[in-house]
């Protein structure tokens, strides 16, 4: 494949494809090449396998409205989603929300407060899960009433969707549940924005099927969050190619900074992590085209009741957000 000359080389035979011409199809031994905005789409036909998709530069995404005042994607400013991993108490949630509200005002950013009312996917049965949906939503409602911040939390069962949508602005589907059709559809039917974590076991290309499930029930406010891919046992890596691939499906893409630092099960009954890589990878994702950034922020990570090895302090969040804003201002859009 020679993308520099926009053509294809197969064996000893070469077929050039000139930019600006009408779309054509070139068949070479069961291989089809369909030009699309100067870059070809490559599809394997003989064995029915997928070889990949090269999207044009300057690929714009549609925007998604989170509230009347906050929209992200397209030409809009980046969205930041931040808060403690799990609701530890009413007092702690409110304290962290106040801290993040001050950070929002200081940096003049669009920010959504996140915290989980139930961590149903904890490594161990002994791990803290949170207050549950009723108390958890009551606490999140109090956060919104005091700070005015929009809210995100996870749902784990389709029956929770309508109840959660009464309080939340974004319903999030956890990575391990991203292929659960009934769950994704129920969240989408609420009409709220839906963020789906791409499972560690999925390729970026497969995530389009998740978006299609939301669109099928009439909701075009569904987006994908990249949170790393399994790389052997107890390790995740972030493939930066995922961002242009996911954006090529037309929806904005969020990068989950802190969960991609995880070492799943790395501490036996708890997940380990490498938070020292949060800042460089956040910079890389900003350069690769991420439209939003998710981070779990805690005032005392070593004492956190969940993900203590990957949550970051507010001052670290400030540094990361400042980096992202500087990069976004310096780089042309992809």
List the predicted regions and their residue ranges.
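Short linear motifs in low-complexity or flexible loops
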Residues: 7-8, 16-21, 31-35, 40, ...
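Alpha-helix-loop-beta-strand connector modules within alpha/beta enzyme cores
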Residues: 102, 128-151, 187-193, 244-251, ...
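Catalytic alpha/beta core domains of metabolic enzymes, predominantly
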Residues: 191-297
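Catalytic beta/alpha-barrel core
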Residues: 131-132, 149-157, 169-182, 193-204, ...
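Glycine-rich, proline-tolerant flexible connector loops at the mouths of alpha/beta enzymes
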Residues: 80, 84-93, 112-133, 298-308
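Active-site-adjacent loop and "lid" segments of alpha/beta metabolic enzymes
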Residues: 126-134, 151, 170-177, 233-237, ...
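N-terminal amphipathic alpha-helix/helix-capping segment at the start of soluble metabolic enzymes
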Residues: 59-80, 332-334
């Amino acid at each position: 494949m020679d993308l520099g000359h926009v053509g294809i080389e197969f064996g000893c035979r070469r077929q050039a494809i000139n930019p600006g011409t009408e779309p054509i199809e070139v068949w070479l031994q069961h291989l089809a090449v369909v030009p699309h905005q100067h870059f070809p789409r490559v599809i394997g036909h003989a064995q029915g396998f997928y070889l990949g998709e090269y999207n044009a530069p300057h690929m714009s995404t549609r925007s998604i409205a989170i509230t009347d005042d906050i929209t992200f994607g397209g030409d809009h400013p980046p969205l930041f989603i931040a808060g403690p991993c799990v609701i530890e108490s009413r007092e702690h949630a409110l304290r962290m929300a106040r801290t993040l509200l001050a950070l929002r005002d200081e940096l003049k950013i669009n920010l959504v407060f996140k915290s989980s009312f139930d961590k149903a996917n904890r490594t161990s049965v002994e791990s803290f899960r949170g207050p549950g949906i009723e108390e958890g939503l009551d606490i999140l409602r109090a956060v919104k009433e005091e700070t005015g911040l929009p809210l995100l939390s996870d749902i784990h069962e389709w029956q929770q969707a309508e109840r959660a949508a009464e309080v939340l602005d974004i319903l999030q589907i956890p990575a391990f549940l991203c292929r659960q059709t009934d769950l994704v559809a129920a969240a989408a039917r609420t009409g709220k924005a839906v963020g789906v974590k791409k499972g560690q076991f999925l390729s970026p290309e497969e995530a389009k099927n998740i978006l299609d499930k939301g669109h099928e029930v009439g909701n075009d406010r569904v987006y994908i969050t990249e949170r790393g891919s399994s790389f052997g046992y107890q390790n995740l890596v972030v493939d930066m190619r995922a961002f242009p691939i996911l954006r090529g499906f037309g929806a904005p893409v969020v990068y989950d900074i802190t969960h991609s630092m995880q070492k799943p099960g790395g501490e036996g009954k708890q997940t380990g992590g490498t938070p020292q890589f949060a800042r460089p990878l956040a910079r890389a994702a900003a350069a690769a085209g991420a439209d939003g950034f998710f981070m779990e922020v805690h005032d005392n990570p070593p004492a956190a009741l969940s993900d203590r090895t990957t949550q970051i302090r507010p001052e670290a969040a400030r540094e990361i957000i400042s980096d992202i804003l500087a990069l976004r201002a310096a780089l042309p859009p992809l």
